């Protein structure tokens, strides 16, 4: 008997439960896919039939699966309980000739179930890797759900077609190597919408006025003016009137509010909470959650549902009563708000409530703690908060009211389980109406309005979900793609669009606004959901999209000119060689200023105004290019020359870009010695840290790369941090050294000064 899952870690956990009854193996994720670079990989005329190929490096996996399935009397396909898992199960059935992967018959079209052609094949699903869940699933096998599988295939084909056509156009019209995506491009547009608001923002002055008073019982009471004047004269008047006035308590407002228990985590809310509270990137969160799920510690982590099973509710209720008391227990059902809640999943929760700490890595332990606390809190009583507002003014009047706000937790409720979610109590002194107050100081402080804040990863996920763009299971990959493409920089969890991201988004908004709009992307997600439900036809959906889209791309290919200039340079930026005006151009390294008379004049400046030479003499190595050194006529034959690219120095062909040959390992020994700091790598203890250049500038990484991937962004000093014993690196002018570990207080000069 053969039991197939998609993860080696998951197969290891399940093997312990099945005690030798089954041979448990894995597909190691997706092992077949549609090629990224070949449009011929999809047969459009035949009804958008993809030509699947074995993923490079997975040939052995596919071969072993075929061999094992051929020998087995029974094959259990136990891949994940979602569209991706259904697709993997279908691919296994196809390559192993198990018969359950054949197209739908007329009888099976409504249900989406393929007819069983081979009785030894069974498909099972479970939402937690525990022995009871697996045994229950084995007792209730089903067919492969062709609707779910088709929904996954439709998404993949859509993304490929969108990317093939639009990315090819951007390569021709903007710059080679750029890309557009059906979901990544709308996400980039959202970031750029905010960025343009920030650029257009003009700050305005306002004044904050604060009065320090004492109550009758000599207790301090700090009050803030309820109005913030935008004229200094008005602020001066209020302060002057306040100084000579007699102060009293005008009114006291007390309200009792209830802070409702939060719902257990969905994929989206888990990613947001992990980002906000743990500082974890979405991809990091999903990796840690995957590990916890495969080890049997949490339920399936890709879900839109906030529902807990009846068994889980009872288990949590029993735990809450025993741990906190009966008054803290309030079992409840949190209704799922998402219209796309997929495939009857549960919320993300611990599989064993009694286990407070589990996980094989620090990230898994921190994430499990967050999941555990949220699941427990979701079944507890609301917290009761008493809020107080004291309003004060002068007896003579003539100035706005001043107010102080306080809050006190009367009953902790669910906050007992999740104290980090509690806001700090602000206790105000006891006063009565008309009680006199003694003014000890009153002052005004000039401030300026602030621009909208850039999106954090958590904020962008929330916005994508609100607009219906993508699905929670895709958010992590969206973030990763934007960063990998250098369209966005991630700094302290904040997402900063780059100049390159701006250029690509501007091009798409000017030419393909309808295809990267909220409505188009959201409606397409709804259509994919309808395929999964058997309500929409796969071929019709793709035909309705691709017919008009491909026609529009062809029209734009003819009408859009090559984007050589992306704007005019500031008037004060003149060509350093001939004095002509300059224009903004795009290079592999970003934007720069070029003489408007190019190619007659090759004067250039950085965006900051520093001039540079665009024609650096290339040093020949004395070798012919292995690819074109003999194949071209004399005078045009390629020679190997030393070049410098965005990732540092390399040896390549003199005929670049026509010939893209690059000699591997061609860095000179002299250059290697010059770049090596001699500081031993703290991670592998074998290599040393050497200077390298990446697309974001200079960094220092281990010479033992790729076996060791340790890297820091500044030159190491060789000393160890007094706070955490990590490696120290060069800092700023005011602080010569700082810790290389981001989580350490010693990493940030400002925090270090505060300490």
Stretches with model-predicted labels:
Residues 100-120:
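Intrinsic disorder/low-complexity segments
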Residues 129-208, 254:
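C-terminal or mid-to-C-terminal helical accessory/interaction module adjacent to the motor/catalytic core
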Residues 1, 167, 200, 253, ...:
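Basic, low-complexity terminal or inter-domain segments flanking catalytic cores
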Residues 80-82, 175-179, 254-263, 273-278, ...:
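Conserved short loop/turn motifs at secondary-structure junctions
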Residues 1-100, 119-153, 422:
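Intrinsically disordered, low-complexity regulatory segments
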Residues 229-263, 271, 435:
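Metal- or metallocofactor-binding catalytic centers and their adjacent structured scaffolds
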Residues 8-11, 21-28, 55-72, 85-90, ...:
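Amphipathic alpha-helical transducer elements in NTP-driven molecular machines
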